[in-house]
Amino acid sequence: MAAIEPNPNGKKVIVGMSGGVDSSVSAYLLMQQGYQVEGLFMKNWEEDDTDEYCAAAEDLKDAQAVCDKLGIKLHTVNFAAEYWDNVFEYFLAEYKAGRTPNPDIMCNKEIKFKAFLEFADDILDADYIAMGHYVRRSDASGQSQMLRGVDGNKDQSYFLYTLSHEQIARSLFPVGELEKSEVREIAKEMGLVTHDKKDSTGICFIGERKFTDFLRTFLPAQPGKIETAEGEVIGEHQGLMYHTLGQRKGLGIGGMKNSNDDPWYVVDKDLERNVLVVGQGGKHPRLMSVGFYADQLHWVDRTGPNDGAKITVKTRYRQQDVACTLTYEGDDRIKVIFDEPVAAVTPGQSAVFYDGEVCLGGGIIDSLIRE
């Protein structure tokens, strides 16, 4: 693997040790390259003491075992207050407003590359921080850019679009140069306890709990009607916030007379009437949009693409890039028109833009353009 920096000797890197395989191997690779490496474990959520399985305690144990094996120091820090104020409150407010937020993106913005970086700077005297994210950093243009990870299936640039070039310049991403299978192989060869630990999925503060049960403890749900796009009432929902555009499972409808066998999808949410609108088929006209408006913009280079730029966009993680044209509607609002209509574009989610391998930045989808 190419060295991340020509002369890493003596430079101090604080690695965000999560107790997973990616951060474990990141620490090892940086040591191999001659960096002075220390780990930092973040606790971002205060679990209920009644939780049968305390994930954070298990993760800390694994992080400590890896650091012991590598012979490096592990620090710990509690960011639960910062997480609550900057990530969780936002998450609840968005759901309350009928949108579908992405807390992982907000966590990267406010915690992993802000609170963590400040702590590493002020308390641990770091030259760099490092994370186990599958992205790459390039300094070829004279300014740090973020590129997609080599492993297209694990690329996490979508979740990191809020980073500025200054933050990227202070960050190292060793596993971004590797395939996931290679990362597990390295961990196995090194005898790291995390080599076969399964990847964490879902939202960290929900853990193993059912999403609807978790949300119900914080937000009062208001049941209402489920209607077809033609206005026929065909069922009841337990709360609009439990549903997202394009959702197919968990609607509790089916076997309708006079309907074909195509599955039902959520095609709209009528907030004023508290009605969930459904239609049949993944390409239902109400599910399709030709574009969208977005705001809360973040550009990695702080200026963004040119007005009228022809680039590509992802409107959700793991989606294939879609060719589009971007135009500005003021300082903090853009209009995006797809080359081809796209299904299930969802307000509250992030739209992330690319020029080839380079992640340019993105914004929050505000409203859809249907035709």
UniProtKB/Swiss-Prot annotation:
Region of interest: Interaction with tRNA: 154-156, 316-317
Keywords: ATP-binding, Cytoplasm, Disulfide bond, Nucleotide-binding, RNA-binding, Transferase, tRNA processing, tRNA-binding
Enzyme class: transferase
Binding site for ATP: G16, M17, S18, G19, G20, V21, D22, S23, M42, G132
Catalytically driven reaction(s): S-sulfanyl-L-cysteinyl-[protein] + uridine(34) in tRNA + AH2 + ATP = 2-thiouridine(34) in tRNA + L-cysteinyl-[protein] + A + AMP + diphosphate + H(+)
GO molecular function, one term: tRNA binding
Physiological role: Catalyzes the 2-thiolation of uridine at the wobble position (U34) of tRNA, leading to the formation of s(2)U34.
Protein's name according to its UniProt entry: tRNA-specific 2-thiouridylase MnmA
Species the sequence originates in: Shewanella loihica (strain ATCC BAA-1088 / PV-4)
Protein encoded by which gene: mnmA
